[in-house]
Amino acid sequence: MAFDKDAIIASLKDATILDLADLVSAIEEEFNVSAAAPVAAAGGADGAAAAKTDFDVELTSAGTAKVKVIKAVREATGLGLKEAKDLVDNAPSIVKEGLDEAAANDLKAALEETGASVTLK
């Protein structure tokens, strides 16, 4: 049987919507396929566009008032004096991880008041 694409297209142009719906159903049944559009999986660029919910507070620089920054880090994290000093001395370093946006912004503001440079990741 010869396949005449132009004849098929001409036949489809003359068909009614009901005839075309029946044709689609018959093709789906005959070839065990679905005419439904595939649903794209979430992720990739769409995932990056989603609102971020967890933030890490990174101390990028202690500034000139290192003692005040160490005190603020101790208050925020509950670390001991040595651990807080090491964290500040080894900047850039993560002060706290997995905070919600409000808590991360509060901690950032508290550290910046002491003269530290802070970024949210």
UniProtKB/Swiss-Prot annotation:
GO terms for cellular component: cytosolic large ribosomal subunit. Keywords: Ribonucleoprotein, Ribosomal protein. GO terms for biological process: translation. One of its GO terms (molecular function) is mRNA binding. Pfam families: Ribosomal_L12, Ribosomal_L12_N. The keyword Hydrolase does not apply. Homodimer. Part of the ribosomal stalk of the 50S ribosomal subunit. Forms a multimeric L10(L12)X complex, where L10 forms an elongated spine to which 2 to 4 L12 dimers bind in a sequential fashion. Binds GTP-bound translation factors. Forms part of the ribosomal stalk which helps the ribosome interact with GTP-bound translation factors. Is thus essential for accurate translation. Belongs to the bacterial ribosomal protein bL12 family. This is Large ribosomal subunit protein bL12. The gene is rplL.
